[in-house]
Amino acid sequence: MIALPQDRMDQLLKRFSMIESQMANNPDSDTYVKLASEYSELQDVVGKIRELSDARMEASDLAAMRDDASTDAEMRALAVEELPEVEKRIAVLEQDVQILLLPKDAADDKNAILEIRAGTGGLEATLFAGDLFRMYERYAAEKGWRVELVSASEGDAGGYKEIIATVSGKGVFSKLKFESGVHRVQRVPETEAGGRIHTSAATVAVLPEAEDIDIEIRNEDIRIDTMRASGAGGQHVNTTDSAVRITHIPTGIMVVQAEKSQHQNRARAMQILRARLYDMERQKAESERSQARRSQVGSGDRSERIRTYNFPQGRVTDHRINLTLYKLDRVMEGDLDELVDALISDHQTALLAELGEQP
């Protein structure tokens, strides 16, 4: 039996009942939207706590029936038969509640900025960067999310040297945050006459989209430069200084946007800068919080090789959790749920172990 914090569970039940009452009595109040949001957040955990409470009561009744000598023999036999099944259900519910009570990542409900950059491997790396972007596009479509292109630098033979997009929808960052790192591909390029397998890589960064309230950027901390946007081969695509480069002086972080609209470039560059600064703060806080024992998956180290896509063998391997799937074709079509769910589960297990080590 898992030792769950009963006081915390009772507080959540009490708070949920209070919200239900306030929403029913004041449907037109100014606080209704806020209450409805909190109600929605608590629904899952409160539902599981109530299920667990009912199951425990059922187990107690069955145990009492089994141990009561005055109970009809047939009823006692029935209790003996049913009790183990109820106890199994309790064990599952306790695990569910424990996970739902874990500290929430404040960024989990945010949208994300997805950045993919070709790494080692030349032309093959740019093609792979394009393959990864299409994989995430299809995954997003399956989830009902919206993907909007921010900027793209195309490769000479297709794919991308770099591509940045925003991904918007429910729970985007919670699902994509473990995709950050180096993705490696092993396959035979179409131009390889000898059939040799080449290895190349692309780097993925997933940043939670930050709002003004999340991160403060002071005007005196940024320098904004404008320049002419260049097209393929370096030719100027227009005669106005539409490209924008924003430098965050304290950190040295630089963001460049070079589309046709200077106003749009400035807004996009600030959006990406804000996300990178917010991500930097999150990484620093995570490092300080669990320096002694960092979650293997949660580190988000951009230089860490996290996954290998082996085309000749039709397999994909996530090195952080030693998971290998022989369905590479489906993964490249956006079927990422098995990988994503395994990573989330591993992270939750690490958090539970971390909490268990606390005095």
Curated annotation (Swiss-Prot):
Q: Which GO terms describe its cellular component?
A: cytoplasm
Q: Where is this region: Disordered?
A: 283-309
Q: Which InterPro entries match?
A: PCRF (IPR005139), Pep_chain_release_fac_I (IPR000352), Pep_chain_release_fac_I_sf (IPR045853), Prokaryotic/Mito_RF (IPR050057), RF-1 (IPR004373)
List residues, modification N5-methylglutamine. Answer: Q235
Q: Which family does it belong to?
A: Belongs to the prokaryotic/mitochondrial release factor family.
PANTHER family (alphabetical): LD18447P
Protein name (database record): Peptide chain release factor 1
Q: Which organism is it from?
A: Brucella abortus (strain 2308)
